[in-house]
């Protein structure tokens, strides 16, 4: 008897044993408790748009559904604005969003100006960190909410700290709270398909001479459990003469489990208006040579359309038919795998293979 003939009965016995154990696991723990990865119905990670085309591209489509996302950065860098745009995108597509306002600082007028349906936005202003995270867990387990934003981790104050005296030291209480919460809610997030975005603040490590002294609050648990971590910074103040009208923000994808990490996206945030979607479109149109810049002038199909970036954005906003045509052409070029390499997507320069094809991305919101 050949070696192959000897192996065949062993293989059949293994397959039979595997079928028996899989059946036993499903009877004990329910259907879907174990499966072959190729049989999984959710192999492709769906995404929620960030509201900024350049950032969607850097993330591989947007915020992944059913995952934890952390957005951190210094004060006034655009963290809350970024998440309010995500809420607006979810609502635009008929989804339900919730905002857990631990900082008690949500401005409904500003949120409405960014396109948020404030009448239907679920808002909670919890008294303690435990209360906030319990509310988050219950919203996730309902499977009726598509996006939950927690603003912010630094404001999730443990009950022991609130009930104690002002000078009391409750060492590590917030880190323990976050660690327990992440263990509890992560599994539920994956099952429900709800995206949870935690906003976080920066602190400085004491006594650090070499390396980056910055760290985020709430311990290390969130860093491990987050599928995506975004580092957002203000890099420029936008001015017309002496009047400041917005900021230029840079976002580095510090961690990404669903697409290549370390990409960088830049976009404008206008005071009172939020992310400049037309500005993002102009950046990508210029990079894909749909709109050509020569000196201060921008041209489209051989005709000058604006002198300076601001005037070109205004022209595109006023000529919606051409704007929509440019947007379609940009998406088509990205679908073809055209390399995008300039200030807004610097991280793609090092490897053209990193360019994301839009047809490989499934965006649902």
UniProtKB/Swiss-Prot annotation:
ATP binds at residues 73-80. PROSITE patterns: RECA_1 (PS00321), RECA_2 (PS50162), RECA_3 (PS50163). Belongs to the RecA family. One of its GO terms (molecular function) is single-stranded DNA binding. Pfam families: RecA, RecA_C. CDD domains: RecA. This is Protein RecA. Gene3D superfamilies: P-loop containing nucleotide triphosphate hydrolases (3.40.50.300). SUPFAM superfamilies: P-loop containing nucleoside triphosphate hydrolases, RecA protein, C-terminal domain. The gene is recA. Its main location: cytoplasm. The keyword DNA-binding applies. Keywords: ATP-binding, Cytoplasm, DNA damage, DNA recombination, DNA repair, DNA-binding, Nucleotide-binding, SOS response. Can catalyze the hydrolysis of ATP in the presence of single-stranded DNA, the ATP-dependent uptake of single-stranded DNA by duplex DNA, and the ATP-dependent hybridization of homologous single-stranded DNAs. It interacts with LexA causing its activation and leading to its autocatalytic cleavage. The keyword Isomerase does not apply. It is found in: Cytoplasm. GO terms for cellular component: cytosol. One of its GO terms (biological process) is SOS response. It comes from Prochlorococcus marinus (strain MIT 9312). It comes from the Bacteria.
